[in-house]
Amino acid sequence: MIVLMAIDTIWLYGNLEGHKKQFESVQKSPLQIDKVAGILFYLVAAIAFFNFIKPYSKNKEEAFKKGALMGLCMYATFDLTNKAIFTDYKWDYAIKDTLWGSFALGLASYTIF
């Protein structure tokens, strides 16, 4: 899902210092990206799109809505799990990242439908 990866890159690098600050406060060390895990996430997102969004969408608008809902669920699972287990994971970051994920997967679904 190259489209989602491109959209996410804007989010990640557009606020790199904010992301670094959040994750360094949680892991108590400099931010390190595991590229294999990142690629696997986008592979799972592509599987979700082709199995749950594309077959059940009649047009781009429906694909956007279903993609946004899928993104909300995927990113909320990540962010709320982090909030539940890491005391330094901030609510404002969890909310912003979840909303971003909803928008990003919605836009990616709209674009590639």
Predicted regions and their residues:
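Juxtamembrane/disordered regions of integral membrane proteins
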Residues: 1-113
